[in-house]
């Protein structure tokens, strides 16, 4: 049977045994990819600096998902938080990868078995002897089983009752660790940044799924609904399954891009909105004011700022700074962060403190402008020196560093001051190693950006797939060219076509 590439799936349309076989093979490929990708990432991952070179800077994609579910140790003797590990146990990163690869092999064998032994009695209607599936019953079974799994995940894994819990951190991504989570049953459970909502929603959705599954197993659909929604046609299953998948893809694209308790910044990197709103800058400022209230010097106050917090407040970690065709990890862009130089404080010759205006997310270049506390422009790096009034040289701008590697060092040389003013546009100033990875200096996106782009794109494609297959199954008689006023009911069977004399006819 010569089929074009876009029609090949018709071979399993009326063949339940081989329909199972191809789904088993698909699951084998997914599981095998997950395990293989995990092993590849573990081979290239450098766990030595979880503060300045975390997994998301290195472009890791599956390691963050394992970590948020409670995996933190490696058979290589390291932990994601930086400690040395002596006994990682079976549920290490490598252990999870191996389990996926073994599962992939077993699914591969199962797929072959079902392809060979496709004609099972299980799939034949006792009355007609023809291949058939009780799709509403199968729907009930799947709904029940997925409900059990969903409930078990929320009630046992997330709560720590039988499992590790999940990755929990503070809003600024400083104190993350795996710990059990109590379900949040109040209104706070609907806050996407409250981890307790993950437990309570899985428990509630699981119970709903179990009840709905039992309902569909015990109650048959009315005949008009069965016919109206084409419940006897396997393409209806395909259409509604695609709908479930694209809906889920749109949801997770949103929770990833805008941030949520399920996508911690320690594992996936900060969101673009944290840069846009000065989220980390405000927290740093609050801590500095708090330290000054305790009569600490500026140097002491800035030295108390965690390097991790300062690193978040750097535009190169903004996932929206990457470009669509800039492949690779963040480290391949601006380089591997080596150390924080400290906070640069600029002053004019009168001693007034000046603040460098930060670059907005969607700018590649931005004028260097220094403003005072009232937001009035006091200095800049002019485009045309002939017309300049506020140049660094004219205003006499100096820079002094507090905290970090250059703590207490000041510069008055205009060229050096301008260099640090340009770098201060990008947030806190860090030293980068661009030689090791031959980094090109062009910003890359984090896994947060890639995940969002991928899932939003595929969700859109799958949306069209849902419309396509839904229309095909709902309007199958129209597409087949059958007159709706025909007085004989035409039953569709295997390889049936219009005008086939063997078609069963039943007078209405």
UniProtKB/Swiss-Prot annotation:
Which free-text remark accompanies the cofactor?
Answer: Binds multiple chlorophylls. PSII binds additional chlorophylls, carotenoids and specific lipids.
Please give the biological process terms from Gene Ontology that the record holds. photosynthetic electron transport in photosystem II
Q: How does it sit in the membrane?
A: Multi-pass membrane protein
Q: Where in the cell is it found?
A: Plastid, Chloroplast thylakoid membrane
Q: Name one GO cellular component term.
A: chloroplast thylakoid membrane
GO MF assignments: chlorophyll binding; electron transporter, transferring electrons within the cyclic electron transport pathway of photosynthesis activity
Q: What does this protein do?
A: One of the components of the core complex of photosystem II (PSII). It binds chlorophyll and helps catalyze the primary light-induced photochemical processes of PSII. PSII is a light-driven water:plastoquinone oxidoreductase, using light energy to abstract electrons from H(2)O, generating O(2) and a proton gradient subsequently used for ATP formation.
The UniProt entry's sequence similarity note says: Belongs to the PsbB/PsbC family. PsbB subfamily.
Record protein name field:
Photosystem II CP47 reaction center protein
Q: Which organism encodes this protein?
A: Marchantia polymorpha
